[in-house]
């Protein structure tokens, strides 16, 4: 009886160790296989794509439940706070159309701090970016003086526009 018990314990231990080691690999394979994933996982960062984050895949929940808890408790609150502050301080005076600006955010998994911010504009908005406070918005998001380059990405309307609601500033 003792021998059977030890074999069962050993088998369970091997299963859980294999599961733990393959967790990152599984998540990465989901990222590469599906471009609509909410999160792209790296060694130390989590990339928050501007897709509708309420869309949850069962595979993601099974592989990485911790990331969803992290999203609900940390990322969502910070994003909502950033959206409100940017709108109040900068965007209220700019007559841009709805869905003209997309914001990409990267948070550190180790510290939970926001580390990268990218703004993406529609083509017609690029003509007015000289007066648009891009650097100020990025600096405010990063909570520091912005000394790096500002990247402006051109966006062409696509079939996923109606999904970009979670991390887009609704400009009215």
Language-model features: where?
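Bacterial Sec-dependent N-terminal signal peptides
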Residues: 1-29
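Charge-biased low-complexity segments
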Residues: 21-172
């Amino acid at each position: 009886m003792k021998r059977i018990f030890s074999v069962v314990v050993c088998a369970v231990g091997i299963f859980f160790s294999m599961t733990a080691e393959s967790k990152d690999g599984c998540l990465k394979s989901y990222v590469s296989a599906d471009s609509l994933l909410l999160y792209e996982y790296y060694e130390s960062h989590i990339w928050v794509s501007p897709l509708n984050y309420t869309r949850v895949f069962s595979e993601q929940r099974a592989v990485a439940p911790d990331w969803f808890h992290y999203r609900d408790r940390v990322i969502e609150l910070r994003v909502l706070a950033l959206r409100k502050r940017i709108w109040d301080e900068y965007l209220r005076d700019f007559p841009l159309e709805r869905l003209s600006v997309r914001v990409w955010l990267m948070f550190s998994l180790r510290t939970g701090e926001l580390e990268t911010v990218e703004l993406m504009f529609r083509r017609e908005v690029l003509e007015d970016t000289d007066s648009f406070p891009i650097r100020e918005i990025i600096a405010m998001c990063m909570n520091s003086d912005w000394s790096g380059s500002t990247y402006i990405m051109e966006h062409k309307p696509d079939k996923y526009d109606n999904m970009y609601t979670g991390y887009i500033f609704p400009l009215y």
